[in-house]
């Protein structure tokens, strides 16, 4: 399902830190299946400020830290179960090792999917030291960058220091190799946007690291994500924007 031939060292940039854009990861049919069945079950609201960044979005576990099976697999479509199986495969880890030059086989993996609805965002930050490398996939079939919700590669902690903006379109993905300078953010989703920004973060941790998304003893209530405008409403909104530009 994932085109692992695209995982080559040449895909990584050295500026402003080690990161890379990898596109065209799925065939049209697989991409359509993943977009059409993006998970809505077992989400929790993630919101706060941790001393470095502010954040607000909805998150669901796809693969728990160090697990060998998908989370809540009975609620996943066939396409999403296949994707989870590929992420758990030795072939995917080998491709990540080839891409980054790091030994992904010895790292602990966690995978979460997210909906970013209106006003959702993730402020400028560098990842925690426990995170070695993160691979972010996107699952929107269309997206207006004016609606925000785009991963922003930064050259410093200031949101204005933009190096690259990546829209969350199906087949797009970004690899971030953690460093003291690996600043990035997700721009706020515009309040008038009713199509969630959909992503999946595959994070490789140092062995023995705890999950910050799902800490031990976490009792946060889970819910079905319902913050979505009906298809006709989305179409009408797009037509209105085209008319008013």
Indicate where each model-derived feature is located.
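N- or domain-start disorder-to-order transition segments that initiate the globular core
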Residues: 1-8
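Non-heme Fe(II)/2-oxoglutarate
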Residues: 9-99
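Conserved short histidine dyad/triad with adjacent acidic residue
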Residues: 114-127
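Substrate-binding/active-site groove segments that recognize
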Residues: 135
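Catalytic core of Fe(II)/2-oxoglutarate
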Residues: 126-131, 139-142, 147-245
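Localized chelating/binding microdomains
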Residues: 12, 20-22, 30, 38, ...
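A short coil-to-beta-strand element that immediately follows conserved catalytic motifs
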Residues: 103-112, 147
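Proline-centered turn/helix-capping motifs that create local helix->coil transitions or kinks
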Residues: 43, 104, 141-145
């Amino acid at each position: 399902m994932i085109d692992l031939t695209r995982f080559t060292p040449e895909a990584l940039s050295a500026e402003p830190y080690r990161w890379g854009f990898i596109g065209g990861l799925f065939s049209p049919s697989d991409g359509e299946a993943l977009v059409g069945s993006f998970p809505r079950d077992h989400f929790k609201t993630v919101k706060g400020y941790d001393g470095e960044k502010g954040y607000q979005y909805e998150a669901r576990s796809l693969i728990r830290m160090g697990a060998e099976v998908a989370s809540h697999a009975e609620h996943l479509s066939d396409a999403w179960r296949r994707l989870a199986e590929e992420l758990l495969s030795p072939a995917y880890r080998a491709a990540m090792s080839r891409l980054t030059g790091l030994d992904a086989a010895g790292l602990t993996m966690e995978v979460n999917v997210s909906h970013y609805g209106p006003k959702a965002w993730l402020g400028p930050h560098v990842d925690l030291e426990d995170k070695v490398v993160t691979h972010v996939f996107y699952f929107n079939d269309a997206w207006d960058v004016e609606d925000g919700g785009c991963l922003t590669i930064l050259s410093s902690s200031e949101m204005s220091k933009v190096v690259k903006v990546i829209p969350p379109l199906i087949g797009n993905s970004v690899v971030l190799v953690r460093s003291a300078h690996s600043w990035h953010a997700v721009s706020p989703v515009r309040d008038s946007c009713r199509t969630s920004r959909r992503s999946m973060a595959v994070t490789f941790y140092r062995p023995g690291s705890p999950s910050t998304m799902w800490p031990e003893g976490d009792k946060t209530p889970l819910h079905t994500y319902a913050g979505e405008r009906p298809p006709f409403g989305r179409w009408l909104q797009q037509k209105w924007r085209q008319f008013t530009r």
